[in-house]
Every structure is written in structure tokens, then in C-alpha cells.
Amino acid sequence: MSRTSWSAAAAVALLPLLAACVPNDPAGGAASSDAAGALTVSSTADACEVSADSAPSGTLTFSVTNDGSDVTEFYLLADDGLRIVSEIENIGPGISRDLVVQAAPGDYYTACKPGMVGDGIRAAFTVTDSGQDVGPTGDTADQLAAAETSYVAYVKDQVGSLIAGTQEFADAYAAGDDARARELYAATRVHWERVEPVAESFGDLDPALDLREADLEDGQAWTGWHLIEKDLWQPAPDANGGETYVPLTAEERAAAADDLVANTQRLVDQVTADGFTFEAFQIANGAKGLLDEVATGKVTGEEEIWSHTDLWDFQANVDGARVAYEVLQDVVAEQDPDLAADLDQRFVDLEALLAAQGSVEGGFGPYTDLTDAQVTELAAAVDALSEPLSRLTSTVTGA
């Protein structure tokens, strides 16, 4: 696969295709060139050159050198491009570090992210079958601790992409480039929708960023995405309570854009602060919460009432729920293999229906273009997933 721009969105998941991540060598000595599974990586501002595009399963060592002028990161991603198998952060210019992982056969991606925020550079990578056993290790407590670390990495990556996209969106909107702002709106919001349960844990951040007009209380100031959404897709009087919509002034636009960026930065600051954690029960509850978001807001078409970009949010909520489940999947499979099998299939079924409508990368049509039968089918698939997902928390906590 040719190298392409990539917006990383991922969790350091405990996957069936991953046995364990060996701690990174902080000194960064390179692996011997004739060792099995030894690869070199050169990261620059516009390239991520890996010495091979495949390796045998087992222990892999990526010796990563930053040949660019900015701090970089290196990732090994799972086959969906949304889950980080393992990563190295904060590789300074001229520095080399090793990423050592144990990987089972399968399709992966390698990725460098110069600057550590926003887009990155990826390439397909294949792990062939060496015949070596690669399986889960550690007791349940260790697996849950690793899952929590995994999910925090996923959240940090998502909010990094979110702040970069939000800044670009806000700049376009404040400058009056409505066409560009509309183009960026849904694609940027997916990073928010994937990790919204984390924002909700910080109290006032969720309403500051994602409050719908229909949920405003008397005297409450309206800020965030949906204020700007309405201004970009201005409603006719019959869709605005019979009143003619009054567009925001240039000054009001600038204030709304600045507020959106500032509140998003607050989220970034919270999740990148020392000591930020998200426990296993919160991850599991968050997976169910994201499906509830779909059932109450996306299936009904009420979330994006002006732009009708609900399918983007729908997909992002499902992405977030799936990643939350998958970081816990090994524990679920051990505790209740039937539940794990059921969840695996229900996610496949729902995502197949969404794939028929488009993708985050390629875009979706307006939610209002769906037929009643299609909406009903999506709602049924959400319900079918929601029931087994409601048992996730009790399964991983042993309640």
C-alpha cells in the first residue's frame, strides 16, 4: 500500500492478534541486523521509511530513528487503523529508540507522526505465521491494568486529532469560509464522538462543547459545535420555530470559534495531565454509553438536526464502543466466551450496515436520505448490540 496521510485514532488494545508489548528500550539501542524480526524505521517530516513491509510472528523490534527536525512518534497499528498495538512517543530529532512487541500473524500498519499531533504517515505491514505461539499473558488484574493504559493512549490520540481539526475548522469558520468549515465539520467531530464518555467525566466540558439547542435551559448560554452548526446550515423559518434565523455577526463568529478551541484545549489538558486514568469499569460503561448515544440521538436524527451529518457521529460512536470493548476483549473472552463471541458478531453486523452507507474516510450522505426501512434496520442492529454490551461492565469487574 502506498504511504498516505493518516489521522491516528487508536487504542493500545489487548487483541487476539497481540500477545504482549515488551517495554521500550529508553536508551534506544538498535537491534542486530541479522536478528529475526529486527527492522529499522526512519521518520522525517514527510516520510516513514520501514526497512521491510513484513516480518514473521513473534518478537518484533522496530529501531526507530528520527531523521527529521521535529519530535515524532511511531506506532504499530492493528488492521483497522484505529487501534494502537504499541507506540513510542517523544522521539527527538537525531534520537533512536526501540519498540519491541510480540505480534501474531495478521495485517497491521506502521505509522509515524511527526509533530505528534494531527495527521501522520502510514504503510501496510504484514506479520506472517512463523509457527510460534503468541497468546495472552498475565492474570486478570494485569490485563485490566494494560487495558486501562491502552484506552488512555487511545483517548490521548483522539483528542490530539480533535484539537488539530478543531483549530482548522474554527479558523475557516471565523474567516467566513463556510464551504471549508462545512467540509471539516463532521470529519473533525468524529474524534469527539469516539471518546465523548471521557469528556462527560469532566462535568461542564460536554455541555460547553456539544449541547444541542433543544436541550438549552432557561438563561443558559449556548456554546460549542451545534451553535456553529446552525449558523453554517441556516434553517428556514418553519424549522426555526417560525422565526427568521439571524446569522451570527463576524464578531460573534470569532467569539464562538475561539470558545470552541479553548474548551477543546481544556479537554486536551485534562487527558494529558499527569495521573489521568480511566478505569476498566469506566471503559466498559463508556462503551454502553456510546451505544445509548446512538439509540437516543443518532438513530432519531436529532443530534445533527441542521447538518444531517448523523451517520458520521453514528459511525464514530460505534468505533468508540468497539475500541472500548476490544481493549477489554481478552478478559471478556476468559470470563464469558459466549458473550465475547456474541459481541464480536453484533459489532460486525452493525458495522456492515454502516459500511453500506459510506465511511469516515470516504464520507456519508445526509441522514435524511435514509429510508424508513434503513433506519429501522440500523435501530434493530443497535438494539441487538446494546443488550450484550450492557453485560460488559459486570463481566470485566466480576460483579
Q: Where does each model-flagged region fall?
A:
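Bacterial N-terminal signal peptides that target proteins for export
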Residues: M1-A10
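C-terminal motif of bacterial Sec signal peptides marking the signal peptidase cleavage site
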Residues: P16-A20
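Short, low-complexity, disordered segments immediately C-terminal to signal peptides
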Residues: C21-S42
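Extracellular/periplasmic metallocenter environments
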Residues: D25, T40, G92-V134
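Beta-strand cores of secreted/periplasmic/IMS beta-sandwich domains, seen most often
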Residues: S51-D70, R97-C112
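Beta-strand signatures of extracellular beta-sandwich domains
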Residues: E73-L77
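Surface-exposed loop/edge segments in extracytoplasmic proteins
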Residues: G81-I88
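Mature extracytoplasmic or organellar-lumen-exposed domains after removal of signal/transit peptides
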Residues: G135-A399
